């Protein structure tokens, strides 16, 4: 048995275990002058330092605040190529349609990714995942979705599988961009070939579909997600990024883990999420990078929804390599309070991935936690441009 008593905790701050909805997202537990006992990578006890159980191994954290490790529920961390020319063109006023016509946009990323080996994709993704972890993300979801064909999608997921030896990763098969021709045959192939293969090889725990006018229709999304559920996979949906066409309502009907983006969500979508068990995942890095309207985080919480926050790390719309930064942006751009943002980036983000064993500092939870530079946990939401995270601990081990 491996046991350590962590002391020197000015504030131990945590939401309760499990998904938090509405006003409950603001209800954090704060223990001052605290201690935490970790046994075999799992939290065994938390409380006042003066009441701490005896232990032969004591680690003094030095009088700083401790919070749960962050969970990033939405990334596209595996890609090849770059979008630097697109970025310069866009900020110079070039329309996206013209960028696509020049050979840029998402299809340039798809071409570069499809041309890359598994080994090359691993090497490209590793420093991105290291940056996320350094920012406080102890668990990270990674999607496929940049493959020009099914073989490229498989290589992306195989790269994630290799990287799972180094990081806590949750792999998702993303059905992202419809082909320019033969859509019906493509959707049929996804349902009858790609999803069964991914499920049989255990390369993903969930299937996500981009449901938008420019992507997959509601009916196509329904067909794909039904196939995923038939093969024992969880389901998620990208919806309401540009227009609300019914993807959110479909996700709630199907019991999806989460609906992600939601920048264009209106009252009907907010009410559907509030009445469901589906997590509303908002992505403020997209708002920052593209200058688009923010998702209605404040309205979602006030309606009683469970809100999570992710980076949406990707080369086109959110080149954001910090989970702490998007926590801070959720406060500034989406109207969350700091306690709500902490809940959104921990227990609710874990719930959006189907995880129940992490996100809170409580007995029985994985000992994933952050020691900050500050003695006040609110620096996590306050600081911009530098990391307030001093140490990252996964299963009781500093990484």
Curated annotation (Swiss-Prot):
Binding of Zn(2+) occurs at 74, 76, 238, 312
A Pfam family matched by this chain, by name? Amidohydro_1
A GO cellular-component term linked to this record: cytoplasm
Q: Name one GO molecular function term.
A: iron ion binding
**Protein name in UniProt:** Imidazolonepropionase
**Alphabetized InterPro entries for the sequence:** Amidohydro-rel, HutI, Metal-dep_hydrolase_composite, Metal_Hydrolase
Where does the record place it? Cytoplasm
**Keywords from the named record:** Cytoplasm, Histidine metabolism, Hydrolase, Iron, Metal-binding, Zinc
At the top of the EC hierarchy, this enzyme's class is hydrolase
Give the lineage.
Bacteria, Thermotogati, Deinococcota, Deinococci, Deinococcales
Q: What is its main location?
A: cytoplasm
Binding positions for Fe(3+) per the UniProt entry:
74, 76, 238, 312
Q: In which pathway does it act?
A: Amino-acid degradation; L-histidine degradation into L-glutamate; N-formimidoyl-L-glutamate from L-histidine: step 3/3
Q: Which family does it belong to?
A: Belongs to the metallo-dependent hydrolases superfamily. HutI family.
Q: Which SUPFAM superfamilies match?
A: Composite domain of metallo-dependent hydrolases, Metallo-dependent hydrolases
Give the co-factor note. Binds 1 zinc or iron ion per subunit.
